[in-house]
UniProtKB/Swiss-Prot annotation:
GO terms for biological process: neuron projection development; regulation of ARF protein signal transduction. CDD domains: PH_EFA6, Sec7. Residues 71-95, 445-463 have a biased composition (Pro residues). Residues 512-706 form the SEC7 domain. Residues 67-96, 154-195, 250-277, 307-401, 434-536, 976-1024 are annotated as: Disordered. The modification Phosphoserine is found at S126, S156, S720. GO terms for cellular component: cleavage furrow; dendritic spine; postsynaptic density; postsynaptic density, intracellular component; ruffle membrane. InterPro entries: PH-like_dom_sf, PH_9, PH_dom-spectrin-type, PH_domain, Sec7_C_sf, Sec7_dom, Sec7_dom_sf. This is PH and SEC7 domain-containing protein 1. Guanine nucleotide exchange factor for ARF6. Isoform 2 and isoform 3 induce cytoskeletal remodeling, but lead to distinct morphological changes in HeLa cells: isoform 2 induces cell elongation and formation of actin-rich protrusions, whereas isoform 3 promotes the formation of membrane ruffles and loss of stress fibers. Pfam families: PH_9, Sec7. SUPFAM superfamilies: PH domain-like (SSF50729), Sec7 domain (SSF48425).
Length: 1024
C-alpha cells in the first residue's frame, strides 16, 4: 500500500471539497495517450488562495501542483479515455501502480514580477495557457490572511511555493484582452516550453557558478506581503534562473533586465527579515547537475468553464497544431530546458534530442472570471508525454466536483502512469485545531500492473544526476534510505539506465523507482518454499548426502527419515550408520526416532547389540561409530533401566564389548585379552564403581564364543551375485568372504565373472584352523559336503551341483575361498578319512578337503597350485619395525601383471631368498634356549620361512613343467607331471610338490597345532 501525506499550515484552513460536480460537467476530450510502462510515480499538491466565492457559487482556490512523473518517452499507442466505455471510472489503467500524492495547501500571495510586469493578480491563466493577460485587482487580505506558511519539502518540487511567481503578466477576470509581456531587453522571458515561453540564452549560465550558491541558502518560512520587496524579487529570480537557466538569450543581444524596486506599502515587511519557504542544500559541484524543471498553472474553475479549450489543448499535443485563435509566440525563441519540444508543439524532439528530463511539475492556480472565449495558444500548450489515467475509488455518494475536476486536470494536463484514489475523503478534512497535527495521512491501494509493450527509449544527452538541490532537511532520512536501496539494486537496474527517474517524490517516501517493465532480480524469482526446504527435508524426501552440521532440527522430518531408514525405503544398510552418526541436532533426532523401532526389554547387553548390528552396517570413522553406539546405549538403558546403573555405564560397557570383539577375533598375532584383563580394564568405570563380575564374565564368554557379526549390505551382495552369473559384467565389486573366516577386510574376494572354470566336483570340507593358525572351536570343525568350483583364483563351495550360469546364494558366497598365494598338499598324516588334502591360504587358514578318489585328490592339488602359481602377484616388502616381534607380511590378492617367464623368475628368486633367510634364522638361534614369548616368535618365524620356501619351490616347478608342455590345458600339465616322476634322466620331481611324491618322516616330533616341519622332511600334525 502506498501512502500519502497532507500537510497544511495550522493557522489556515484546509481544502473542503466544493459541491459535487455532475459527471456531465467534465470535459469530453479526445482519447488520451496510453502511459508508458516506466511512468508510474508522481506527486500532486493542492494550493489554496484565500479569495471569495466564484461567479458560479463555487469556492475558488482548490488547485493542484506539482505532479512529477518518471521520465520516459511518450507512448505511440492511444488508449481509450478513462470515462469511456472501455475504461469505466474506478478501474486502474493497465500497467498503473500506486504512488505517493502530497496534497499541499499554500496560501497564495501576489508577487510582483520584474521589470514592472503586472503581478497583482498573482499567477494567471494567461501564463498557464501560454498567453499574457492584463493585471487584475486583487481583494485586500484580512489581518489573518498575511500568514507565514510552512511548506513541506518534496524532492519533486524544485521551487518552493512562490518560487514560480515571477510572472510575465496577469489577467483581470473582468476584462478579456490580454496584455502581452515585454519581450526583448526589458522582458523577463518570452516563451517557455511548458506554456511559459522560451528564455533568452544569454542568461543560461548566469547563475551556474559556485559563487551563486548564496541564493540557495534560504530559510524555512517566508511571508507573502501585498507588495513584494526587491529582496524577494531577487530571491525569486535567483531560484528561477538556478532551476531553469538564465532568462535572456545571448543571441538576442539584449541586456539583462533590471529589477524594479516597488514602493513598499504600510503593511509590507522588510525583505531582509523574511525567510524563504523551503530549506535546500546544495554543494558547489551540484549546481550544474540540477535538472531543469518547468511549471504550469491551471485554474480549476476556468477548466470547468472552458473545458472545450482544455480539450483542444490536448488535441494540439500530438499534431503540433494549436486551436484557432491561439496566440503564436516567436518560433525563434529557444527553450531554457530540454522540455517536450522547443517549438512547444511536437512531442518527438524530446526523443530525438535524447532529453532525459521531462516536464516535472505543474502548478494549477485558481483565477476569477474565467471566460470561455479565451483559448490556449499554440506556444503555451503543455506537451504531455502520455495522458494520466485515473483509477478512482469513489465514495458511497460518488465523487464530488472537486475530486472529479482534480482527476480531470491530472488526466488532461499531465502524463502519468499512476493510479490515484478518489479525493472524496477530503470532505471530512477540517481546519486543524491548536492541538491537532498539521499532517493528514491516508493510504491508497496499489493497482496491479498489466503487460504493456515497452516504449522506445530516448537517447539521453547526458546521465541524469540526482536532484540534490530539491532535497530538503525533511527528506534526509528518506533520501538516505533510497541511496542505500539504489546501491543494493545497482547491479539489477544497470541494464535499464536508459530510463532514469528524476522524480524524487517517490524517493522521499522510500518508494522504489524501478520501471514497470523491468524484471525482478533472479533471487526474487526463486520460490520461498525451495529456500525453506533445507537439506534435511530434501534428505527425508530421498536424498542421502545432504546432511551437514548446523542444520535446524525438524522433528517431523526426522520421524519420516527414521522410518525410511528402518524400512530401508530408498536407503541401503550402509547408509543408515552414516545418517545416524552425524554431529548435528537433526541426526540426533533421527537416531532417537530410529532406535524407537528396537525393543531391547529383557535382553542382555550383548544380545541387544547383536540385534542392533544386524540391521545396519557399522561403518565410518571412529567418532561416527561411537555416536551410533551412544544412541544404542541410550535406547538400551531406556528399555532396561534396572540392568545397569546409568546410561553412561551402558555406553562404556558397549564400547568395551566392541573392543573385546576386535581383540579376540581380529587379525592381530599378539596375546589375546583374557577374562581377567577384561574385568580389570573396566574397574571404576561404572560411575566411579565397578561392574558386577558375573555380568562381565558372561559378556566375555559370549563374545569369545561367538563374535559380533556386522550386517552385510544386501544390495552390494546381490550385485556381486549377479556379477558372478553374468559372463560380461561392466563393474566388478569386491566382496568380503571366506568360509569360517572373520570376514577380514584385508582378504577381500575379487570376483572375476569372465574367469575360466578350471575344475569342479564334489568335496567334503572341514575347517582345521582359523587365520593365523588359531585353533578352530569344536562347534565349527565338522565335515560338510559341497560342490566345489575352481573359477579363477576363487574356490566356490555350493550346496547343489554345479550349473553354469546359476547365481550363487549368500551362504554359498560366504563359503568361497581365495587361493592366491595358497598351497595344497596331501594330508598324509590324517588317517580318519581317505583322499584328504590340506589347503593353507595366504592368511594361514587351514582347510581339509576329502575328494571322492585318489585321482580327484591329485587333480585338485595340482590345479589349485598351478592356478595360484600363475596368478599370484609378487608380495610387498616386509614391514620395517624397531621391535623384534615377528609379523607376517600381507600378500596381495590381485592377479599378477607379469608374463609367464617373469613369473617363473620371480618365484625362483623368492625361493632362494627364503632358503637363505631360513639358514640365517637357524644359525642365529643355534645353541640358544629361548623361553616364553621369544621362543614362540622364533618357532612362528621358522615355520613361516619353511612354508614360504616350500610354496615358492612348488610354484616354480609347476610353471617350468607348464612352459615345457607349451599348453594351457591343465590336463596336459597333469600328464606331464605324471611323466616327470619316471623320467630317463633320473631327475626327481620337485621336492616342494607334496601332492606328487610325499615323503614320510622317520621320526615324528611334537609340534604346535597348525605348524609344519621343514620342507621335504614330512610333517606330523595333531589329528583334529
Amino acid at each position: 500500500m502506498a501512502q500519502g501525506a497532507m500537510r497544511f499550515c495550522s493557522e489556515g484552513d484546509c481544502a473542503i471539497s466544493p459541491p459535487r460536480c455532475p459527471r456531465r460537467w467534465l470535459p469530453e476530450g479526445p482519447v488520451p495517450q496510453s502511459p508508458p510502462a516506466s511512468m508510474y510515480g508522481s506527486t500532486g499538491s493542492l494550493i489554496r488562495r484565500v479569495v471569495g466565492p466564484g461567479p458560479r457559487g463555487r469556492d475558488l482556490g482548490r488547485v493542484t501542483a506539482p505532479c512529477t512523473p518518471l521520465r520516459a518517452p511518450p507512448s505511440p499507442h492511444i488508449a481509450p479515455s478513462p470515462w469511456g466505455p472501455s475504461s469505466p471510472t474506478g478501474q486502474p489503467p493497465p500497467g498503473a501502480q500506486s504512488s505517493v500524492v502530497i496534497f499541499r495547501f499554500v496560501e497564495k500571495a501576489s508577487v510582483r514580477p520584474l521589470n514592472g510586469l503586472p503581478a497583482s493578480g498573482g499567477l494567471s491563466r494567461s501564463w498557464d495557457l501560454g498567453g499574457i493577460s492584463a493585471p487584475r485587482p486583487t481583494p485586500a487580505l484580512g489581518p489573518g490572511c498575511n500568514r507565514k506558511l510552512r511548506l513541506e519539502a518534496s524532492t519533486s518540487d524544485p521551487l518552493p511555493a512562490g518560487g514560480g511567481s515571477v510572472l510575465p503578466g496577469s489577467r483581470d477576470p473582468s476584462r478579456g484582452p490580454l496584455v502581452p509581456p515585454q519581450i526583448g531587453a526589458d522582458g523577463l522571458y518570452s516563451s517557455l516550453p511548458n506554456g511559459l515561453g522560451g528564455t533568452p540564452e544569454h542568461l543560461a549560465m548566469h547563475f551556474r557558478g559556485p559563487a551563486d550558491t548564496g541564493f540557495l541558502n534560504q530559510g524555512d518560512t517566508w511571508s507573502s506581503p501585498r507588495e513584494v520587496s526587491s529582496h524577494a524579487q531577487r530571491i525569486a529570480r535567483a531560484k528561477w534562473e538556478f532551476f531553469y537557466g538564465s532568462l535572456d538569450a545571448p543571441s538576442s543581444g539584449a541586456k539583462p533586465p533590471e529589477q524594479v524596486l516597488p514602493s513598499r506599502g504600510v503593511g509590507s515587511k522588510q525583505g531582509s527579515g523574511v525567510a524563504v519557504g523551503r530549506a535546500a542544500k546544495y554543494s558547489e559541484t551540484d549546481l550544474d547537475k540540477v535538472p531543469l524543471r518547468c511549471y504550469r498553472e491551471t485554474d480549476i474553475d476556468e477548466v470547468l468553464a472552458e473545458r472545450e479549450e482544455a480539450d483542444s489543448a490536448i488535441e494540439s499535443q500530438p499534431s503540433s497544431e494549436g486551436p484557432h485563435g491561439t496566440a503564436q509566440p516567436p518560433a525563434s525563441r529557444p527553450s531554457p530546458c530540454p522540455g517536450p519540444s522547443s517549438s512547444l508543439g511536437s512531442g518527438n524532439e524530446d526523443d530525438e534530442a535524447g532529453g532525459e528530463e521531462d516536464v516535472d511539475d505543474e502548478v494549477f492556480e485558481a483565477s476569477e472570471g474565467a471566460r470561455p472565449g479565451d483559448h490556449m495558444p499554440h506556444s503555451g500548450l503543455l506537451k504531455s508525454p502520455v495522458p494520466f489515467l485515473l483509477g478512482t475509488s469513489p465514495s458511497a455518494d460518488g465523487p464530488d466536483s472537486f475530486s472529479c475536476v482534480f482527476e480531470a486536470i491530472l488526466e488532461s494536463h499531465r502524463a502519468k502512469g499512476t493510479s490515484y484514489s478518489s479525493l472524496a475523503s477530503l470532505e471530512a478534512l477540517a481546519s486543524p485545531g491548536p492541538t491537532q497535527s498539521p499532517f493528514f495521512t491516508f493510504e491508497m491501494p496499489p493497482q496491479p500492473p498489466a503487460p504493456r509493450p515497452d516504449p522506445p527509449a530516448p537517447a539521453p544527452l547526458a546521465p541524469l544526476e540526482p536532484d540534490s538541490g530539491t532535497s530538503s532537511a525533511a527528506d534526509g532520512p528518506w533520501t538516505q534510505r533510497r541511496e542505500v536501496e539504489e546501491s543494493d539494486a545497482g547491479a539489477t537496474l544497470a541494464p535499464r539506465k536508459e530510463l532514469p527517474s528524476p522524480s524524487h517524490s517517490e524517493d522521499s517516501f522510500g518508494l522504489g523507482a524501478a520501471p514497470l517493465g523491468s524484471e525482478p532480480p533472479l533471487s526474487q524469482l526463486v520460490s520461498d518454499s525451495d529456500s525453506e526446504l533445507d537439506s534435511t527435508e530434501r534428505l527425508a524426501l530421498g536424498s542421502t548426502d545432504t546432511l551437514s552440521n548446523g542444520q535446524k532440527a525438524d522433528l517431523e522430518a526426522a520421524q519420516r527419515l527414521a522410518k525410511r531408514l528402518y524400512r530401508l525405503d530408498g536407503f541401503r544398510k550402509a547408509d543408515v550408520a552414516r545418517h545416524l552418526g552425524k554431529n548435528n541436532d537433526f541426526s540426533k533426532l533421527v537416531a532417537g526416532e530410529y532406535l524407537k523401532f528396537f525393543v531391547f526389554t529383557g535382553m542382555t547387553l550383548d544380545q541387544a547389540l547383536r540385534v542392533f548390528l544386524k540391521e545396519l552396517a557399522l561403518m565410518g570413522e571412529t567418532q561416527e561409530r561411537e555416536r551410533v553406539l551412544a544412541h544404542f546405549s541410550q535406547r538400551y538403558f531406556q528399555c532396561n533401566p534396572e540392568a545397569l546403573s546409568s546410561e553412561d555405564g551402558a555406553h562404556t560397557l558397549t564400547c568395551a564389548l566392541m573392543l573385546l570383539n576386535t581383540d579376540l577375533h581380529g587379525h592381530n598375532i599378539g596375546k589375546r585379552m583374557t577374562c581377567g584383563d577384561f574385568i580389570g580394564n573396566l574397574e571404576g568405570l561404572n560411575d566411579g564403581g565397578d561392574f558386577p563380575r558375573e555380568l562381565l564374565k558372561a559378556l566375555y564368554s559370549s563374545i569369545k564364543n561367538e563374535k559380533l557379526q556386522w550386517a552385510i549390505d544386501e544390495e552390494e551382495l546381490r550385485r556381486s551375485l549377479s556379477e558372478l552369473a553374468d559372463p560380461n559384467p561392466k563393474v566388478i565389486k569386491r566382496v568380503s568372504g571366506g568360509s569360517g573366516s572373520s570376514s577380514s577386510p584385508f582378504l577381500d574376494l575379487t570376483p572375476e565373472p569372465g574367469a575360466a572354470v578350471y575344475k569342479h566336483g564334489a568335496l567334503v570340507r572341514k575347517v582345521h584352523a582359523d587365520p593365523d593358525c588359531r585353533k578352530t572351536p569344536r562347534g565349527k570343525r565338522g565335515w560338510k559336503s559341497f560342490h566345489g568350483i575352481l573359477k579363477g583364483m576363487i574356490l566356490y563351495l555350493q550346496k547343489e551341483e554345479y550349473q553354469p550360469g546359476k547365481a550363487l546364494s549368500e551362504a554359498e558366497l560366504k563359503n568361497a575361498i581365495s587361493i592366491h598365494h595358497a598351497l595344497a598338499t596331501r594330508a598324509s598324516d590324517y588317517s580318519k578319512r581317505p583322499h584328504v588334502f590340506y589347503l593353507r591360504t595366504a592368511d594361514w587358514r587351514v582347510f581339509l578337503f576329502q575328494a571322492p578318489s585318489l585321482e580327484q585328490m591329485q587333480s585338485w592339488i595340482t590345479r589349485i597350485n598351478v592356478v595360484a602359481a600363475m596368478f599370484s602377484a609378487p608380495p610387498f616388502p616386509a614391514a620395517v619395525s624397531s621391535q623384534k616381534k615377528f609379523s607376517r607380511p600381507l600378500l596381495p590378492s590381485a592377479a599378477t601383471r607379469l608374463s609367464q617367464e617373469e613369473q617363473v623368475r620371480t618365484h625362483e628368486a623368492k625361493l632362494k631368498a627364503m632358503a637363505s633367510e631360513l639358514r640365517e634364522h637357524r644359525a642365529a638361534h643355534l645353541g640358544k634356549k629361548a623361553r616364553g614369548k621369544e621362543a614362540d616368535e622364533q618357532r612362528q618365524k621358522e615355520a613361516y620361512l619353511e612354508f614360504e620356501k616350500s610354496r615358492y619351490g612348488t610354484y616354480a616347478a609347476l610353471l617350468r613343467v607348464k612352459m615345457k608342455a607349451a599348453s594351457e590345458e591343465l590336463d596336459t600339465i597333469e600328464a606331464a607331471l605324471a611323466q616327470a616322476g619316471s623320467t630317463e634322466d633320473g631327475c626327481p620331481p620337485p621336492h616342494s610338490s607334496p601332492s606328487l611324491r610325499p615323503k614320510p618322516t622317520s621320526q615324528p616330533r611334537a609340534q604346535r597345532p597348525g605348524s609344519e616341519t621343514r620342507a621335504g622332511a614330512g610333517s606330523t600334525r595333531p589329528k583334529p
